[in-house]
Each structure stands twice: as C-alpha cells, then as structure tokens.
Amino acid sequence: DGSGYNLSGRLEFSRKLNSKGRVLSFSLSGGVNDSYTNEVNYSNTEYLQEQRNELVDQHIRYDNKSYNYRAYISWVEPLGHNNFLQATYSFSQQQQESLKNAYTPDLETGEYNVLDTAYSKNYRNSYINQRASLSFKAQREKYNYTIGFNVDPSYSRSENFIGDTVLSDLSRKVVNFSPMIRFNYRFNKQTNLRIRYDGR
C-alpha cells in the first residue's frame, strides 16, 4: 500500500511607483511532495549443493520527500532619456530525500522493527542557488540593449546514510561571475534581430 500528496503555489507582485518607469517586482513560488509505499519481501531459497536454506522475511518502507521554493525581487530605476538601471536578486532552495528501510521481525515480539542494514539505503540531496545582478538598459525607437553583470553563489550537499549511520556526506560551494549582453533590433513589424550573451 502507499499514499502521497503534491502541492505547489506561486505569488507575484509588481507595482509601478512613478510615471517615469520606477518599478518594484516580487515573486515567491514553491512546492512540496511527500509519498510512501509499503512492501513485503518474503522468500525461502534452498541451496542443494551447500545443503542450506536462505530465508528473507522483510517489510520494506519507501519514502520520497521533496520541497522547493524560490524568491525573486527586482527594482527598476529610470535614469532619463529612456535609460534604466535594474537590480535583481533571487534565492532558491531544493531538497530531495529518498528512503528505503527494510525491517525484519523481532524474535521476541514478532514485530517488524529490526532494521536490516544490508537491504536499506537512504540519501538526501540539498541545493541552494542565488543570483544578484545589476544591469543598464537603453531603449531606442529601433533597438534596445542591456549590459549587466551577474554573481551566482551556489551550495550543494549530498548525504548517504542508513539509520543513524552516515556513510558519506559531501558538500560543495561555488561562486560564478558572468557578464550579460542583450541586443534587439527591429527592422519592421515582421523582422527582428536578437543577440544574447550570458557568460560563464
């Protein structure tokens, strides 16, 4: 048997603060997932040459859990003559957890509460990503262009464990810096030229 649920949502807000083009924007999104499955594993294998039996009697529980969310904020400041300065920041986090725990019966009570470490395996992965950017945008009658710079810190962690025993725990931190260039030219209503570069 098993059960689970999956939920997600998104909230957006944007407000123009004056007639010149000052704009504040904000968004928040996220989701969560949680499910489980129960399984019975019973087998009795007889090895004739070795004259022995191998009995496997287990109740296995599978759990899969995850969540994620992202927050974003943007500020656009008009500089005059159809020129704008934009600052943005985003923060996102994601975590995934997959558990497989096998239990054998207690010899005294018969309840399946003894963890079988040979058949159990659990892992958890976590990710955090950020981006801060500052850009200049110019709008003209036939064309517009944007020149900016991004800073992208990120963090990841991967854990492998059985019960309370940690088998491996690896983490990594990285910071990337990248330029950004965008150029759009409108020849007519049907024809546009677009150039975009996001360096890494």
Name what the model sees in each region.
Residues 1-200:
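Primarily recognizes Gram-negative and organellar outer-membrane beta-barrels
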